[in-house]
Amino acid sequence: MAEIPIDFPPLKIQEKIATILDTFTELRARKKQYAFYRDYLLNQENIRKIYGANIPFETFQVKDICEIRRGRAITKAYIRNNPGENPVYSAATTNDGELGHIKDCDFDGEYITWTTNGYAGVVFYRNGKFNASQDCGVLKVKNKKICTKFLSLLLEIEATKFVHNLASRPKLSQKVMAEIELSFPPLEIQEKIADILCAFEKLCNDLVEGIPAEIELRKKQLDYYQNFLFNWVQKIRN
């Protein structure tokens, strides 16, 4: 082993590679931590332990609480020929699902998108102007008892359970999405849980991706949410 020659790039490149790998390691750890708290706090039994045993839950199918649509065919050539500020979301899962930006705007407001093909069943919360490709399903909440962010969190967990593995191309169709059943506590509780989990997820990402000058502030904010969530979990377990 001692005699095996190993080639090294210049020190600055070594350090850059090490930093990138450390960032990926940190991001994976944060994502696991977020997923643990999300799954734990969205559990119906745990919600009742936090807010009271008599908290009512209502069960709906997605089709009963949402308008369900699908995106349209948007090619890379179309994106090149129609540049603009509004993102196009596709069935991709990297880069938040962005395929590019165009001047069109098919959707504007608070929505949920999901990937229908390929990496099917991946769910994203959207808020603003955007477009969706034909491999992307779109949900718009129409029931005032439902918090869109809370629904997106539930679907992050549940949607992948309904993916059909057809040959080598997994699929989650509009029809299947429409039939998924989900249970919801009162709106006020949905909003509280969604706000804390979404803030925690954002801080986890900002801590990894942010500029150095902001890291210390992000860590303090993250510590606050970690303690808040930890205390919730302890309350449930006790």
From Swiss-Prot:
GO molecular function, one term: DNA binding
Keyword presence, DNA-binding: yes
Domain of life the protein comes from: Bacteria
Matching Pfam families: Methylase_S
Keywords, ordered alphabetically: DNA-binding, Restriction system
GO biological process, one term: DNA restriction-modification system
CDD domains xrefs: RMtype1_S_Fco49512ORF2615P-TRD2-CR2_like
InterPro entries noted in UniProt: Restrct_endonuc_typeI_TRD, Restrct_endonuc_typeI_TRD_sf, Type-I_RE_S_subunit
Key word Oxidoreductase present: no
Family: Belongs to the type-I restriction system S methylase family.
Domain notes: Contains two DNA recognition domains, each specifying recognition of one of the two defined components of the target sequence.
Function: The specificity (S) subunit of a type I methyltransferase (MTase); this subunit dictates DNA sequence specificity. The single R subunit has multiple frameshifts and is probably not expressed.
Assembly description: The methyltransferase is composed of M and S polypeptides.
Protein name as it appears in the record: Putative type I specificity subunit S.MpnORF201P
Provenance organism: Mycoplasma pneumoniae (strain ATCC 29342 / M129 / Subtype 1)
